[in-house]
Amino acid sequence: MLLKTKHFGEINIDESKIIEFKDGIPGFENLKRYVVLYDGDKNSPFRWLQNVDDGELAFAVVNPFMVVKDYDFEIPDEAVESLGIESILDVMVLSIVVVPEDISKMTMNLKAPVIINTKNNKGMQVVLDTDRYSVRHYIIEELRRQEVNVGAGSDEKEK
Amino acid sequence: MLVLTRKKNESIIINDNIEITVVDVQGEQVRIGINAPKSISIYRKEIYLEIQAENKKAAEIKNVDLKEDLKDFLK
């Protein structure tokens, strides 16, 4: 189907890739269908969580494990149950990113990750019951530290 | 809002599958136990509101090219 996207204009998406968020996500409870878009570089930790029913709604998201190497949590029972998760191999985890005017202050939400069961394309945002992770975790320092390949077009380093 | 008075160890039942029990009362603090189906999401309200606000902020994202914009920071 043709999908209007916030950042990529009108694109053709495979309907079987649509992820159902039964309860939406907090703040956008009525919008329930999303797709994950890559901008062509699978090595980059960034993706877009694009809403299907409202083209103007798209979140920048990251694969948190590519940014925070020791990020670790147990998937809450409520997610295992409502997403019907059978194997950890089917699970995709994304952190929603806030990109302010000053991009150096970009943060990711480690406290409330988006969990997707890629087997049945069901997703939800969960809230971790821990004080270990913050809703506003600064990204730039992490990226610098980890030397993550963000696809920033930097010269390839010699191994 | 419906207001009920409960003592320690007393419960209320909602919709025949959610049980809320007053576990302990110490001055200003009340400990509450909740028995509910696993698929029900339960949040501390202030945290839920914080997540909502954060998501709304995230949705205000302008048309950025993260790759380009991050270049300068990761040299």
Curated annotation (Swiss-Prot), chain A:
It comes from the Bacteria. It is found in: Cytoplasm. The keyword Chaperone applies. Pfam families: FliW. One of its GO terms (biological process) is regulation of translation. GO terms for cellular component: cytoplasm. Acts as an anti-CsrA protein, binds CsrA and prevents it from repressing translation of its target genes, one of which is flagellin. Binds to flagellin and participates in the assembly of the flagellum. Belongs to the FliW family. This is Flagellar assembly factor FliW. It comes from Acetivibrio thermocellus (strain ATCC 27405 / DSM 1237 / JCM 9322 / NBRC 103400 / NCIMB 10682 / NRRL B-4536 / VPI 7372). The lineage of its organism: Bacteria, Bacillati, Bacillota, Clostridia, Eubacteriales. The gene is fliW.
